[in-house]
A protein has these predicted regions:
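Cap/insert and terminal regions of metallo-dependent hydrolase folds
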Residues: 16-17, 29, 54-56, 67, ...
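Short hydrophobic/charged patches on amphipathic alpha-helices used for structural packing
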Residues: 61-62, 208
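Catalytic core of the metallo-beta-lactamase
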Residues: 1-53, 111-179, 206-207, 213
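Short, well-ordered alpha-helical microsegments
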Residues: 57-61, 81-85, 105, 142-144, ...
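Active-site neighborhood of phospho(di)ester-bond hydrolases with catalytic His/Asp-centered motifs
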Residues: 51-52, 71-78, 97-99, 156-159, ...
Length: 246
């Protein structure tokens, strides 16, 4: 179902100086055809940082490599890692960084995915000059690492915001997505994920407050129509299920 996605697929699309996105998919989750998105950043040292890599494509790899050497690949939460194994095969010198608790998942261990480093709230020296990061916690081992690209004032999320366009979804799903507040303009994560994050609500609210304090101009995330402008206002609306943020 190509209607769910944002063509052209599996190609670099410039967003800001040193920052690109790659739209791909669709993936099917809980019967919903989901568009999926990777973010690509060129760090100050000229190396390339891949956030939530999408399906591997040789031409895409070639185009990214033309920007600089791929040195970092990020699995930002416990759900976004499935395409990394093939990228590792083709980028053997790149380090793979993972959200907390990903390494412990049985499916990940059985896959043979190599995890070189585990992320936390402190940006590592490899990209501290370019990116800030915040771990948003939840129950049941859920963690999502959010990143802020200071030069472009872009916040990079994964599943904390899901903003599906009804016109791109099957007609039968549209009322369900609206009821679940997963479609534009609400842009909330699925109900089960909201429940999981609420299990650690106090810590999650603190983390989200840190993200809002960064005042991002734009917010990129994995699924749906990302916030190209007025990022802080849109983010506050999408995360209001956690509480009121001033």
């Amino acid at each position: 179902m190509s209607e769910a996605t944002y063509p052209p697929l599996d190609v670099l699309k410039p967003v800001a100086d040193g920052l690109w996105i790659v739209d791909s998919g669709p993936l099917r989750a809980l019967g919903i055809p989901l568009p999926v998105r990777m973010t690509v950043i060129r760090l100050r040292d000229g190396s390339i940082w891949l956030h939530s890599p999408t399906r591997y494509d040789p031409q895409l790899h070639q185009d990214i490599a033309a920007l600089g050497p791929i040195r970092h690949m990020v699995a930002p939460n416990i759900a976004h890692w499935t395409f990394l194994k093939e990228w590792q095969t083709h980028c053997p010198d790149a380090l793979t960084w993972a959200a907390p608790n990903l390494r412990q998942r049985g499916q990940v261990r059985r896959s043979g995915l190599r995890i070189d480093r585990v992320l936390d709230d402190a940006a590592p020296p490899e990209w501290a000059a370019d990116l800030r990061q915040v771990v948003v916690p939840g129950g049941l081992s859920f963690r999502e690492v959010a990143f802020f690209h200071g030069a472009s004032r872009t916040l990079i999320l994964t599943d904390l915001v899901l903003n599906l366009e009804p016109a791109k979804m099957p007609a039968l799903l549209r009322p369900l997505l609206r009821l679940a507040r997963m479609s534009t303009p609400d842009g909330q994560p699925p109900p089960y994920l909201r429940l999981v994050i609420r299990l650690r609500r106090r810590a999650a609210v603190q983390a989200v407050s840190e993200l809002l304090a960064l005042e991002p101009e734009r917010v990129v995330f994995a699924h749906g129509l990302w916030f190209m402008r007025d990022g802080t206002a849109h983010l506050r609306r999408s995360l209001r299920w956690l509480g009121a943020f001033g």
